[in-house]
């Protein structure tokens, strides 16, 4: 019996490894079959995928995510809407009985609160960087200045229909060289150093030369920049202050704008046309030689300018020439960002009385203090003295003295000079 007890455990011990080996083989066989079956299924699916995948129709709308795109650019993004209000009070020490300050372009009223001009300016300039070659500008104007700037029936056939339009022109950049800018319409004249908007001027009142030379033209203005130092312009227009031509003759102007150094700008213009009304048997010519130079150092404290003008006019070829010549000098000191002081002196020889209706020599000097309260509000306090070599002004005097307070507001997206 003891021998039997030893034999049975030994047999069981030898049998267990044999049973485990059989089970492992069965499991491995089963795994191999499963892997083979899975491979067959994957092969069948790969063959069925091209057949069963739905085909999108050619004209099917894109997925919602594809519809989303960048918003369209704002068409008014580069358009500026601007406005200015320019009013004044002037006192003439001659106390003219008609309340009129003589030889003044804008500040014509004595001892009266007055509106020089209220203007709206809409502008969309060309932008080659944005791929836009066209643009335009519209200046609507109301107030006393319209009577000066628009002219009368002496030079306009129908002044009333253009009265409120100071400027209205379209622009196109011709793809020629650096870009030829062509403007068509009514635009402010660049003859003379001064321009229309008071906020951009050293003085409140305007010079004799601003008052005498053309205010505006209607026609073509072409500008070409040769480089950063030289620009040329050519005008083909109806004439001086003519929205509608009254003699059928087109006036031309040739301009050069040079910037030899950063602090100096020089303008030179030759302007020629016919200013006599048709019919004239042998019409003469009106010639203007105008030049001015501006100096402004980098520190921005000082600005100085000189202007010289010479004009000849003949209504008929064989009549004696009527000449007007002279010039002006300007100096401004920007004491602080808010305070500036400026002076102007000018001389005008009205040899045939074209400007003042009397052959005389006119001079004037002006002193102006400017206080800029903010970007958009400015006050100018000014003293001016006009004088002649002949008794010309009210009450038979040779001089006219005025004191003026001008208040100017402006706002809008346009930066720099208007």
Question: Where are the predicted features?
Answer:
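Outer-membrane beta-barrel proteins
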Residues: 92-96, 145-150, 191-196, 243-246, ...
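Bacterial N-terminal signal peptides
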Residues: 5-15
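Detector for outer-membrane/organellar transmembrane beta-barrel domains
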Residues: 227-231, 254-359, 363, 409
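Gram-negative outer-membrane beta-barrel domains
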Residues: 49, 55-58, 62-67, 301-304, ...
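Predominantly the C-terminal beta-signal and adjacent terminal strand-loop region
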Residues: 367-418
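N-terminal periplasmic/intermembrane-space "pro-region" immediately following the signal or transit peptide
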Residues: 16-104, 406, 411, 416-418
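Outer membrane beta-barrel
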Residues: 67-239, 246-253, 257-265, 330-333, ...
């Amino acid at each position: 019996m003891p021998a039997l007890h030893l034999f049975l455990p030994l047999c069981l011990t030898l049998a267990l490894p044999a049973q485990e080996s059989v089970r492992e083989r069965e499991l491995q066989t089963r795994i191999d079959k499963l892997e083979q079956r899975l491979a067959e299924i994957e092969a069948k699916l790969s063959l069925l995928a091209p057949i069963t995948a739905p085909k999108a129709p050619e004209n099917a709308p894109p997925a919602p995510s594809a519809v989303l795109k960048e918003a369209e650019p704002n068409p008014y993004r580069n358009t500026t809407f601007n406005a200015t209000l320019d009013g004044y009070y002037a006192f003439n020490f001659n106390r003219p009985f008609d309340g009129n300050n003589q030889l003044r372009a804008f500040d014509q009223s004595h001892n009266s609160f007055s509106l020089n001009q209220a203007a709206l300016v809409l502008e969309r300039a060309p932008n080659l960087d944005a791929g836009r070659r066209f643009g335009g500008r519209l200046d609507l104007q109301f107030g006393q200045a319209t009577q000066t700037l628009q002219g009368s029936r002496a030079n306009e056939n129908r002044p009333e229909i253009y009265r409120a339009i100071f400027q209205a022109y379209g622009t196109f950049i011709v793809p020629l060289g650096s870009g030829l800018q062509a403007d068509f319409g009514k635009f402010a004249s660049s003859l003379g150093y001064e321009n229309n908007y008071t906020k951009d001027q050293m003085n409140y009142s305007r010079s004799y030369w601003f008052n005498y030379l053309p205010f505006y033209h209607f026609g073509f203005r072409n500008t070409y920049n040769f480089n950063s130092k030289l620009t040329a312009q050519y005008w083909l227009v109806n004439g001086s202050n003519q929205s509608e031509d009254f003699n059928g003759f087109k006036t031309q102007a040739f301009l050069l704008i040079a910037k030899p150094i950063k602090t100096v700008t020089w303008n030179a213009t030759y302007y020629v046309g016919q200013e006599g009304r048709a019919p004239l048997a042998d019409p003469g010519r009106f010639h203007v030689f105008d030049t001015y130079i501006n100096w402004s150092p980098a520190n921005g404290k000082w600005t100085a300018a000189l202007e010289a003008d010479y004009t000849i006019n003949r209504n008929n070829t064989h009549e004696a020439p009527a000449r007007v010549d002279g010039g002006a000098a300007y100096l401004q000191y920007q004491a602080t960002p808010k305070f500036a002081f400026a002076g102007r002196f000018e001389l005008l020889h009205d040899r045939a009385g074209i400007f003042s209706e009397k052959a005389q020599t006119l001079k004037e000097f002006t002193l102006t203090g400017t206080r800029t309260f903010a970007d958009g509000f400015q006050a100018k306090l000014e003293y001016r003295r006009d004088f002649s070599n002949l008794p010309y002004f009210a009450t038979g005097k040779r001089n006219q003295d005025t004191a003026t307070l001008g208040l100017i507001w402006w706002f809008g997206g346009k930066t720099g000079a208007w």
